[in-house]
Amino acid sequence: MKFFADTAEIDAIQELAATGLLDGVTTNPSLIAKSGRDFKEVTREICAIVDGPVSAEVVALDHETMMKEAEILRKIADNVCIKVPLTIDGLKTCKKLTGDGTMVNVTLCFSATQALLAAKAGATFVSPFVGRHDDNGFDGMQLIADIRLIYDNYDFGTEILVASVRHGIHVLEAAKIGADVMTAPPAVIKGLFKHVLTEKGIEGFLADWAKTGQSI
């Protein structure tokens, strides 16, 4: 499973990238707005930190303007992945962009049939929102399982990018189902490294080693 960071915070991206375990980054207009910086500048800086895909989202809702915005975004760096909403115009834009060799992340997916349409449009990634799905009384992980089954049935190349990840259980369940990618806030990713028994084990080893009076 690939790990993407869902953030526009440069320091957090640098910290995660330094582990060698970060495969990409996803951003959206809300995350960019929080940074208080120019979106091109932020996107360019992120693209220089990570080698993998960096999702940058269009804000237009019509196909023609989406294409104009996508043209601006993809000139920022070679690893920019254009993010479009799962709408008719969004999928029309996806079809055109992927046909030209541009990576596209189709976002705001809330049903398996939407994901099917995204795959037919040639999406590089489809982003089902599991946390938000759960918030509205649905089963986010069942959505991921349904998409996985459909994609396997038809051998679609579109990667399932699990979004709106709230905690480690989401990551675990998505991995068990076979999702290709998960994107999560830095705090969630950093939490995956931790376990109380790991910490206790380290404390015990260090205490025992200190008693020997040795050094390495």
Curated annotation (Swiss-Prot):
Record SUPFAM superfamilies: Aldolase
PROSITE patterns: TRANSALDOLASE_1 (PS01054)
Compartment(s): Cytoplasm
Domain of life: Bacteria
Gene3D superfamilies: Aldolase class I (3.20.20.70)
Gene Ontology molecular function, alphabetical: aldehyde-lyase activity; transaldolase activity
GO cellular component terms given for this protein: cytoplasm
UniProt-listed Enzyme Commission number(s): 2.2.1.2
InterPro entries, per the entry: Aldolase_TIM, TAL/FSA, Transaldolase_3B, Transaldolase_3B/F6P_aldolase, Transaldolase_AS, TSA/FSA_arc/bac
Pathway recorded for this protein: Carbohydrate degradation; pentose phosphate pathway; D-glyceraldehyde 3-phosphate and beta-D-fructose 6-phosphate from D-ribose 5-phosphate and D-xylulose 5-phosphate (non-oxidative stage): step 2/3
Biological role: Transaldolase is important for the balance of metabolites in the pentose-phosphate pathway.
HAMAP family cross-referenced by the UniProt entry: Transaldolase_3b
Family: Belongs to the transaldolase family. Type 3B subfamily.
NCBIfam families, alphabetized: fsa_talC_mipB
Protein name per Swiss-Prot or TrEMBL: Probable transaldolase
Gene, per the UniProt record: tal
